[in-house]
Amino acid sequence: MQRAIFLGAAVIVALLHLTSLPRTIWEYDESLFCMAVENYDPLNHFPPPPGYPIYIAVAKLAAPLFGYVPFRTLTGLSAFTAIAGFILLGFAFRKLTGDTRAGALGAFLFYTSPAMLLHATLPQSDSGALALLAASIWLCGKCLTEEVDTKWIAFAALACAITVGWRLQFAIAVVPLFGMTVLLLRSWRERFIAVQWFAIACAAWLIALIAATGSVEMFWKWMSGQAAYFAEHDADISRTGRSTAQIALRFISHPWGPKWLALPVLALAALGLFDAAKRRLRVALPVIAMSAVYFAFALAMMDPADGVRYALPALPGIAFLAALGIAFLRRITKDVFVDWAVLALYAFGAYAYTGPLLRQRTRSDAPPFAAIQYLRSVAPRNAVILYDLPLKPHSQYLLRGFTRMKVDEGLMRFGHRTDVPLYELTDSATQAPDGKVFRWNTPDAYTKLTRGHYGAASVVPLPVTQRFLALEGISPPERTRTGSWRWIGARGTISLPDLGARSVRLTFEVPLDYPLATNRATVSVDGGQSVVAEVTKGKKTVVELPLPPGRVTLRIVPEQTFVPANVPGRLSRDRRTLSIMLTGLEQAAPRAAAPAAIPRAGSKRAAG
């Protein structure tokens, strides 16, 4: 019966993941990993930091099996390791509990969770790292539950080191798992063997990574820069507007689905923790330490927007405790508790919850991919593509052959070039009349399980009448589903191209949660003629100024400013000095001719 349950669970897990393979590139890191398979260049973020040396090496070896197409290679590798990971995690939990049934059901719970249904088959490093983590748990458990030869201790140490080399972020989970295992080994000789092999294996992949960066100095500079970004963004700014309770929900509850799915899982885990403590289950300590340390670090330091995917290394610990809780209920009810039926219902609920998003991902192009394919079909050869920062990797990988730049960088170089067509590639659904929008439906699973990006993407031709150069005090574009804007700081300076226009029209707004009752801003043309804009909540303020001939500089000077992080009652970490939002700019009645279109390139680059 126990083997039948394990086999049935394996079949269900395989079917769920193999039928949920993504059709095209979707998320930010996917393009970077694909480019790394073609050319491993960690300093240029191919792949993203911190390098993933073992993952990319395995992907390069597997590439011939998938026709040397990086996207297929990485999705195939993720699918294979998802199935292998289930088997390994089942073995690991069986080793720790001594119960094949509990092992199978614990692994089944983890691999049918909404977090895994969505993320396990993406062309990223998570799935393989989780399979290696499962192998590490199994081997560490074997070393603690059996009288093993020292070779098994070496195997456990190697598995832990390879897991870290596959995805370095997993060190936060692997180190406490390995460290607690070492402490529980029977002798100092065994402990020395474990630490020795772990250090040797880590040194091997670390030396390869340093060699790929060129030198120890370059490696240190690269990693220091990434650490500084992590401290500024993930551990600080990204937590804007979120309370501690909201962050905890993001990392601990959301991976298991909505409340009606997550609460039973967490309750079972709490029951399992009680049972483990009551029985003084020594072999459970490494897994409990793994999850506890990882969750503590995540809650204190990691970006909550990506909390569900970032929580993956700690979730096997929750699944293990839930498996203990299930086994406890089965014991006290004398097998009246039908555990496999309960887990089957959970899997059904998890798929019902994530299915609408999974089916879109499987059957249709992701919005960024669809937008880029459309852009390749309409943009002339001399066009410049201005991408939103979240779409930089997509542009690098899928728009080769085009000039691609960030919005302000492109406007600075080509804003005055009326002979150069400009297109904006935006990570949002535009309201521009000439824009083309590509979108998926975004159910609750999208909101809770993803970073909130790439549900829609747009291609927007940028008319010469709406171009300007942000010279001073103008923030980069920010977008939501309802529009886009640029914050103006203590003073904003804008340069306009010479179109022979008679006037320029500017639109200002402020959000509904604006901390000031109202604000006034003086807009002047080259220090000459000026107009005052009165900006209030819920209204658009439009001002128009006459323009002299030639290139023109506009200066916008608000009367009041604020710093979001200093506003009482807000949870903001934004320390910028802000005043009002610029939501529109257009020169009226231009006399310059529109740019002549150059015949577009006939070739397309296929990906996915």
Where is each model-derived feature located?
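Signature aromatic-anchored transmembrane alpha helix within multi-pass, membrane-resident enzymes
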Residues: 6-10, 158, 196-203, 280, ...
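Short helix- or helix-capping micro-motifs
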Residues: 10-13, 106-111, 138, 160-164
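Catalytic lumenal/periplasmic loop and adjoining terminal transmembrane helix
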Residues: 18-20, 210, 337-459, 464-477, ...
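Short acidic/glycine- and proline-prone juxtamembrane loop motifs at membrane-interface regions
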Residues: 28, 49, 115, 121-128, ...
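Membrane-interface transmembrane helices that cradle and orient dolichyl/undecaprenyl
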Residues: 95-100, 136-153, 163
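Hydrophobic/aromatic-rich transmembrane helices and adjacent perimembrane loops
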Residues: 119-120, 126, 168, 172, ...
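Hydrophobic, aromatic-rich transmembrane alpha-helices
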Residues: 181-182, 254-282, 292-295
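Membrane-lumen/periplasm interface segments of specific transmembrane helices
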Residues: 192-245, 258-262, 350
